Amino acid sequence: TATICDTLAVALAGAADPRASALLATLAGGPVQAPGCARGLAAVDAALWFGLCAHLLDYDDDETERAMAHLSVPCLAAALALAGDDGALLSEAYVTGCKAMLMLGAAWNPALHGAGWHPSSVLGVFGAAAAASRMLALSEAQSVEALRLAAALASGTRGAFGGMGKPL
């Protein structure tokens, strides 16, 4: 889709930023080749690095009505890190993650944003968990547990804007 291509393009641009290089220097090697990365990374690190690169310049997509968030970065980062060469499954997982963010965003916004939370961060962990659940073909019980873990990790205030906290 166009949003996947857009996210890949902004991630490649972000990969040239010195802040992306600084993060990359802290990450161990592994088998996953993240777009724009000169070396392989562990899946979790590939998702982290790609997510940072894709959101670093703040040109990624922005859904402004329900989720009030950048949908593509967390969903695509999780799906790409687990995709291998299965493009069809990657697309399904990406859409699954975006739908999760949209459903939660419709329930929680505009109050979430109005209370000072950054919806991309708060909702993004759910989108990433949903996308990863699809990529890994988790059972319903396993997917529920992945979403519970996402709830435990959901955070991100708009007070982080202006620093590395926003793209991270």
Predicted regions and their residues:
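N-terminal core-entry segment
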Residues: T1-L168
